[in-house]
Amino acid sequence: RLDGVTGVQTCALPILQASIINAGDGCHAHPTQALLDIFTMKERKGRVQGLKVAIIGDILHSRVARSNIWGLTKLGADVTLCGPTTLIPVGIRNLGVKVTHDLNDVLGTSDVLMLLRLQKERQQDKFLPSIREYARVFGINKEKLKKAKKDVLIMHPGPTNRGVELTADVADGEYSVILEQVTNGVAVRMAVMYLMSGKKTAE
């Protein structure tokens, strides 16, 4: 795991005689998080292909968003990114996703609402006018959830900022699968380590 550093594992591959598991490198990728997220969707919805997934928040700095975009589009999901203009990367549509800056565009149509953690540094770095304004426009609360599908899944890679990305009653509510993501993460990462140890099939 390399916070703030991108691509070290790629440089290391030619000189190491070992498998490398990327547990998160800078803003680039977080493959095991995407695997557990997709596993959770499949477990709950029975499929990934055709699901409408909205990824909401700081896409620009999110390795979780990038890995989920790659995985979900590969498996046939319909992915829409939603967030402030300043936090959506230029050219991101080239990855086969839609982009909107209006939460209402995704609230009523999405099967999954995946919220991303917003770091306080984004306000300090002038990406946002204020955290409070972000929460007002892009945060999910019970009132906004009334517009969502009755079987929508609320996901978050953690740690959450309660009162920013989502309110406490949403995080702990009936639509939230955040704790399931954590539980599934143990099994998924165990499976990755098992396969990387040289085992190709489950015994």
PLM regions and their residue ranges:
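Adenosine-phosphate binding glycine-rich loop
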Residues: 151-203
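Glycine-rich phosphate/diphosphate-binding loop of Rossmann-like nucleotide-binding domains
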Residues: 38, 43-116
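Short, structured coil segments at secondary-structure junctions
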Residues: 9, 15-17, 75, 93-95, ...
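Single conserved hydrophobic/aromatic residue that forms the stacking wall/gate
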Residues: 1-11
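Short, ordered loop/turn segments at secondary-structure junctions
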Residues: 8, 25-26, 84-86, 118, ...
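Rossmann-like adenosine-cofactor binding region
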Residues: 92-169
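General beta-strand structural signal in soluble alpha/beta enzymes
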Residues: 19-23, 30, 55, 81, ...
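A glycine-rich, Thr/Ser-enriched phosphate-binding loop motif common to dinucleotide/cofactor-binding enzymes
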Residues: 25-40
